Amino acid sequence: GPKIFGKKKGDTEYNLRALPIGGFVAMEGEDEGENVSEGSFNSVPVQSRILVVIAGAVMNILLGFVMMFAFTVQADSYSSTTISQFQPNAFTANTGLQTGDKIVEVNGYSIWNSRDLQFAISTLPYETVEGNTLEVYKERATSAACGVYNKYAKDESLSKDELQKYYNALSEGCSKINKAASKDEAKELLDETCKSIYALDKSYDMSKYKTPEIDTTTSRPRFMGDVKVVRDGKEITLENVQFFTYYADEDAEKENKPTVAFDFAVEPIEKNVGTVLGETFTQTCSMAKTVWTSLVWLVQGRFTFNDMSGPVGIATAVTQVASMGLQTGFVDAVNNILFVMILITVNLGIVNMLPFPALDGGRFLFLLIEWIFKKPIPRKA
């Protein structure tokens, strides 16, 4: 914007402009047509000019590290990518994953931490799966068993110890169902699981028991992909692992916009100086990797420009996360805003280094060519 106020100190002029959002540095001799005088930008060695050009992006990323440290150090512990347990009706448990698996790659996307895992799974493609497959049958069977358990989970007259017995029966039975090799076996194990739950209820009349009906006709969407894990010290690739997929509401179902969710828990990482610094580094690097990957996918057509946000979208996002945080407390609101600011800061640093003429990345490329060939690129063709 236009200059409101300016003051010159030495060879530098400081200005306050009409829109004091961010800032910029204009150096003598960097623009086309300016004279190359002593002390101007183009009069210094090319190595020094390269350092000046990349300094802004480097500072953005370093600031991202500092803010990420402030965000990370508050946590009591951190999440790994090693599966510790599955929910009783976990779909991933019957499509390949096992307790103790350390997930290191999803559909070719390397997994460094839990944030990578969330990004990789949430961006998986989804396909329509027929309802008559063994995997879907086992999922519906475990869900039916959970339905039986839920009747007792709502019973306030049961003590925690009593309810735990019901849950143990459910968990043990679902684990067997997930390992079933056929629908018939899964059905038998479903009966066994339901009866073991009802057997804990002394007032239940077992003669009235009926096998829960399983819908095998309805097709459904499934997020799926190849997952590389470390199991018993060896890397193995599990093909077409299907993740728990659902519609958030009726509108999402009408528009065929399913959502993916985790149906397993991961082992915690103990908090100490080393893990705090390690999480800070890997989380920031993961954020940078996410930005670059998203740009590549944009070129490949996996994302559209409609999925990207400009200033208005960013402002809206900040407002939304702040409002969500305020529902649980002021500190959560501040942390939510801090996380968005980390994302924006790292984004700016990375995008600014893209090799386009209008960005620092384009200038860096020209200076790099000048350094290699010992000759500047002509400013005019």
Language model regions located:
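Small-residue-rich helix-interface/hinge motifs
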Residues: 1-36, 351-373
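Internal alpha-helical transmembrane segments
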Residues: 12-15, 19-88
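Pore domain of cation channels
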Residues: 49-62, 332, 339-353
